[in-house]
């Protein structure tokens, strides 16, 4: 598989371990690089979203965007943290974002996305210690894929 080929179809469900065998990336993070750093993987877990109150804003929006809360379970999230910064810089670096929904060890591919022109906003949500903190909410737009004949 070349670095430009994406082997997974929208709607396809597979084990997360198998996904990482195919394209690389970290097995446990919500945001990770893959394909030797040429793309990003983002995993949304509805159970985690509900636990931390992210479900109030996460997911598909009426305007077609997908909102995703950044990485970091304790204290204020920062856009300068490693994973959040990588996601924020993905558009400038030409890295596609491949979005998945997690359920247990299964992941379902939602599609290829990019950061919106208005890439993020701040919200308040509890951390894992039930203390309110600032979280970054990324705004993702479905990417148009150019086909070469």
Give the location of each predicted region:
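Acidic, glycine-rich low-complexity segments with interspersed aromatic residues
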Residues: 2-108
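Compact mixed alphabeta submodule
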Residues: 103-149
């Amino acid at each position: 598989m070349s670095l430009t080929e994406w082997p997974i179809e929208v709607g396809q469900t597979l084990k997360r371990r198998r996904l990482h065998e195919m394209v690389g990336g970290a097995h446990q993070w919500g945001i990770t690089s893959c394909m030797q750093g040429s793309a990003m993987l983002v995993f949304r877990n509805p159970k985690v979203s509900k636990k931390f109150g992210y479900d109030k804003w996460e997911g598909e929006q009426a305007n077609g965007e997908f909102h995703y809360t950044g990485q970091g379970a304790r204290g204020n999230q920062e856009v300068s943290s490693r994973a959040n910064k990588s996601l924020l810089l993905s558009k400038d670096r030409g890295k596609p974002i491949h979005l998945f929904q997690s359920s247990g060890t299964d992941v379902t591919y939602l599609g290829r996305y990019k950061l919106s022109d208005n890439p993020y906003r701040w919200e308040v949500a509890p951390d894992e210690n039930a203390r309110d903190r600032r979280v970054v909410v990324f705004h993702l737009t479905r990417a148009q894929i150019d086909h070469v004949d």
